[in-house]
């Protein structure tokens, strides 16, 4: 089953739109609009590309035949995959070739998936290590790029393969990383951490429910955290599960996220109508989000935006 999976990036990008659209809070001594907008865009791209790596890994691991002697596999439009079925651990090497088949970005670099010999990805608790080497993603609209290096672990908590999802109740995956290096277009490097859980179910199509699994003090549901390109700490938390449905064109149908910095907190609630009330799938029409943010002086503002 080949699926287009919308990531948390749509949520973060919407928060970025909110900050660029709103007026400066003149009662605060510092205007954080530019920094928060840039950070939201950075986080949205990182979230999208780390999710894309996990999606590509799932595509490559989708059938056990990939470890039965085929030396070269093509299931990703801008990459080739080479399988090593002899070494321990077994590996699948994904090499991105920079082809513009995705329409909005190009990718170069290598991601190596490794799994211990004898371990089957379909089994409960099976884990693969995703080693990311110079994965450079260039956005075609403005030629800006990010480069990702480091490793993450994807665990098939429940067992099962996504190609068999219609016959299964659910499949649960987690993606974690203790530190992935992100290089921004200004050559600034930062280390970000990841802690996400994705639950795949089938209800008139694929349903993906994403949550954050990291806790820091009293803050729970953290999906990503670290220091932004300006050197300031941030967290991106999922306050209410982000739900994406295939029968709604793989769009976010509900959920709430929060982006936090010491000086600013912003949140966005999804799956609303134009009045801000939760709604069912609007078909080809727009969903709306309600964005709320608190300035340094403690005042609260909100806006309803389409997505």
Question: What do these predicted ranges mean?
Answer:
Residues 1-9:
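Bacterial N-terminal signal peptides that target proteins for export
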Residues 9-16:
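Bacterial N-terminal signal peptides
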Residues 18-21:
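C-terminal motif of bacterial Sec signal peptides marking the signal peptidase cleavage site
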Residues 23-307:
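Low-complexity, intrinsically disordered segments exposed to solvent
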């Amino acid at each position: 089953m080949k699926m287009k999976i919308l990531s948390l990036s749509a949520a973060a990008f919407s928060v970025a739109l909110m900050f660029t659209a709103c007026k400066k809070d003149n009662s605060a001594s510092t205007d954080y609009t530019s920094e928060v907008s840039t950070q939201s865009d950075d986080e949205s791209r990182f979230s999208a590309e780390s999710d894309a790596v996990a999606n590509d890994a799932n595509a490559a691991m989708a059938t056990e035949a990939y470890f039965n002697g085929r030396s070269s596999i093509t299931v990703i439009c801008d990459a080739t995959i080479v399988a090593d079925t002899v070494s321990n651990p077994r590996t699948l090497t994904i090499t991105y070739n920079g082809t513009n088949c995705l329409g909005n970005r190009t990718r170069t670099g290598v991601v190596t998936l490794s799994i211990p010999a004898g371990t089957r990805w379909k089994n409960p608790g099976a884990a693969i290590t995703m080693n990311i080497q110079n994965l450079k993603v260039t956005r075609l609209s403005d030629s800006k790029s990010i480069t990702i290096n480091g490793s993450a672990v994807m665990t098939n908590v429940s067992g099962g393969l996504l190609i068999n999802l219609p016959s299964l109740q659910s499949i649960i995956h987690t993606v974690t990383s203790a530190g992935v290096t992100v290089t921004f277009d200004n050559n600034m490097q930062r280390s970000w951490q990841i802690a996400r859980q994705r639950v795949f179910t089938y209800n008139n199509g694929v349903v993906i429910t994403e949550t954050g699994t990291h806790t820091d003090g009293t803050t729970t549901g953290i999906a990503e955290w670290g220091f932004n390109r300006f050197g300031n700490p941030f967290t991106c938390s999922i306050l209410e599960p982000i739900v994406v449905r295939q029968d709604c064109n793989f769009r976010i149908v509900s959920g709430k996220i929060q982006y936090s910095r010491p000086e600013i907190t912003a949140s966005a609630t999804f799956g609303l109508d134009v009045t801000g009330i939760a709604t069912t799938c609007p078909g080809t029409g727009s969903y709306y989000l309600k964005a709320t943010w608190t300035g340094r002086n403690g005042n609260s503002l909100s806006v309803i935006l389409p997505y």
